[in-house]
Amino acid sequence: MKVKGTYFQNSKEKPLVYGDVEIINPKRRRLRGEDEKEGILAESVIVGFCGTDKELMHMGEGGRLSEKFPEGTKRLINGHEGIVWVPEQERFAIVLIRGGDSYDPTRYTEDETYFEYGCDKADGLFSDCNYYNPDMLLPLPDGCVKNGKLSLSFAKKLLFADPYGCMVFQLERMEDIGSAHNFRVEMAKHKCGEEEGRRLAKKHIFDRTVIFGMGTTGMFIGDLIRQNYPEAEIVFVARSEEDKPKVQFVLNHVKAKYVQSCFDSNEKLADAIKEKLGGTATTFLGVSGSNIEHEIAFRYGVLGNNGLYNSFSLGPQVKFDTMPFGFKNQIILSSINFRQEHMEKAIQILAKSSYDEIVELIDKEEFTSDPIDAYCNKIYSAGAPLKTAVIWNEKYINEEE
C-alpha cells in the first residue's frame, strides 16, 4: 500500500524525502513472551519533531542508516511523537514507540531484540497512515475528544508522551541508583536502619541538581524532580539570555535558578554554577549535546563526592581521570528509554499540564514542499521554539476551542 510520507535514506544530497512510500505490515510483538501480531492501520493526526529526527537525517547524509531500516527496505519513515486515529476501533491513540523480543525494554540484553517506531527497524508517524501493533496503541485521557474531534491544546500536550515517559524512567532510575549508592552514609549519619537510610538517600541525591542544557528533556526532568522533591535546589545552565521567553517559561515552571553560559573560561562557568547552587552538585544532568558537560562536571569539580552524572545527550564522549573519580565515589549512568507504565504515567501528567504553550505549528504544505529546508531553517534553527509540530490530518482536530 502506497501513501504519502517523509522518509530517511542513505543519500548525501537527499537524506530526507517527501513522496510516495510503500508501507509494510510485518508481525511484531510488544514484549518477550507475547504473541507476534500483525499491525492495524492508523491515520496520523498530529506529529511532533524531535532532535532524534535531525540526528537520523545526518546519519542518512553520511550513509550510516542501513541498520535502522525496516527489514527488506532501504528507507525509514520517521516520526515517533504524535497521535493517530484508529478507524477499526474508532478512537484516537498514542503509539507506544518501543517494543520487541525483550522482557523489559529499559534493560534489554544482548540476546534480545527491539524496535522503535520511526527510529529503528520500524516505520513511524510521518505518513498518511501506517500499521501498528494493536497492543501498542495507548488510550487518551478522558476529556480530550469532543464530537469526534481531538482538542488541539490536548494534542499539543500529548505530543510529549515519548520524551516525558523517558524522563519518568530517568527519575525512577536515579532514585534507585541514588538510594543504593548512598544509603549506608545516611544510616551512619542518622543512626537509622536500612529502610530509612534508603529513603533518605533517594531524597538527598537531588538536593543540589544541575541541568546542563535547556531543551524539553531537561525541562521535563526538572519538572519531575520539582514535583517529587520540592526542597531540591535546581540550576539550569544554557547559552540563551535569561530574559528569553523559553528560558523564562522553564524557570517559572520548574521554579529553578539559572546560569548563562557566557564566560570566557570553563573554570569561571563552573565557579558560577557552584555559587548559584550553594555548593557542589549531588546530581549533574547533561542534556545539551556538548562535550563541555563532562568537563564542567569532572575536570572543574561541579559534581561533588558521592554524586550522580546522568547523560541524556546524543554525541558527547565522557572523559574523566580514574583516580580522582574513584576517590570521589561518583557514578556515571546513561539511558534513553522507558516502559509502557512510564508512558502511561506521562500521559496523565501531561494532560493536566500547560506544555501546549511551548508548541508551535508548521504548515503541512510548507514542511512537505521542502522538508530538508524546513528542518535546517525553521524546525531546528537557532531561533526555533522548544517544540514544533505539524497537523497531518486536520479533519480530526478541533482548532476552535
Regions inferred by a protein language model and the residue ranges of each:
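Glycine-rich beta-strand-centered segment in the early N-terminal region that forms part
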Residues: I24, R28-G48, E61-R107, D123-G124, ...
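Glycine-rich cofactor phosphate-binding loops and adjacent beta1-alpha1 units
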Residues: A180-T209, R226-Y229, K244-I331, I397-E399
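Residues in the short beta-alpha loop(s) of Rossmann-like NAD(P)-binding domains
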Residues: A238-D243, G315, F338
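Rossmann-fold dehydrogenase core element
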Residues: G307-N310, F320-E360
